[in-house]
């Protein structure tokens, strides 16, 4: 059975990791993609990971397509510039930052840049009809309404969350960071004792999990309700 893990060498170079579960793509002649997840960053390769920021992935691609696909997508950012651009609001993959298919499983059989020169590497666990993933032209943006709901502060910014200046998040955030630290061999950001979980009306369902090695235990983050787009 082929190795399905993201290479440790790549994870050790990551300045940011976005986890976007159950990205849905329904296509017939035109393919549209949408999903919500989280992004954590670090200042250096030996620094602890920041608290997670909620993000949204959107995009579309022309082509003769038919079928429906749901994928769990992981984006590995290999430069500080890429995560700094994300803090500004959004980036377009392939335009604002170079993106390449990550070397794992079927994704490693073609189009793989083993020198890790791209700014972002994309991974997908796919259960539908499409054999692969192309993210060029997709937009990943900060989900302002979800961050407000999760952190309980109106207008909380990505910069505040990344720098530890936002309110203490629910306990699920710390468990996510513990799994992320295990996957990338770093320490977890020291933070105050987590506050009580947010009411179910604000965070009803699991939304994201860290990208551990195959078969590792995961801890989902609670998903805030998403309001109108504020990009």
Annotate each predicted stretch with a short phrase.
Residues 1-231:
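Small-residue-enriched, tightly packed secondary-structure blocks
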């Amino acid at each position: 059975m082929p190795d399905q893990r993201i290479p440790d060498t790549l994870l050790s170079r990551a300045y940011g990791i976005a986890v976007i579960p159950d990205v849905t793509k329904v296509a017939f002649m035109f393919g549209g993609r949408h999903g919500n997840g989280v992004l954590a960053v670090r200042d250096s390769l030996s620094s602890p990971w920041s608290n997670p920021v909620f993000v949204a992935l959107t995009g579309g691609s022309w082509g003769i397509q038919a079928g429906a696909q749901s994928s769990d997508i992981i984006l590995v950012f290999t430069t500080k510039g890429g995560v700094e651009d994300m803090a500004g609001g959004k980036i377009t993959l392939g335009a604002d930052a170079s993106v390449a298919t990550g070397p794992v499983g079927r994704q490693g059989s073609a189009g793989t840049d083993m020198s890790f020169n791209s700014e972002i590497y994309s991974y997908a666990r796919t259960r539908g009809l499409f054999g692969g993933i192309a993210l060029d032209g997709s937009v990943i943006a900060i989900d302002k309404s979800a961050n407000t709901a999760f952190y309980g502060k109106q207008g909380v910014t990505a910069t505040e969350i990344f720098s530890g200046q936002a309110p203490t998040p629910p306990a699920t955030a710390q468990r996510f960071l513990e799994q992320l630290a295990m996957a990338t061999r770093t320490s977890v950001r020291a933070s105050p004792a987590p506050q009580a979980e947010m009411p179910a009306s604000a965070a009803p369902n699991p939304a994201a999990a860290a990208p551990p090695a195959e078969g590792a235990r995961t801890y989902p983050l609670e998903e805030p309700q998403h309001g109108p787009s504020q990009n």
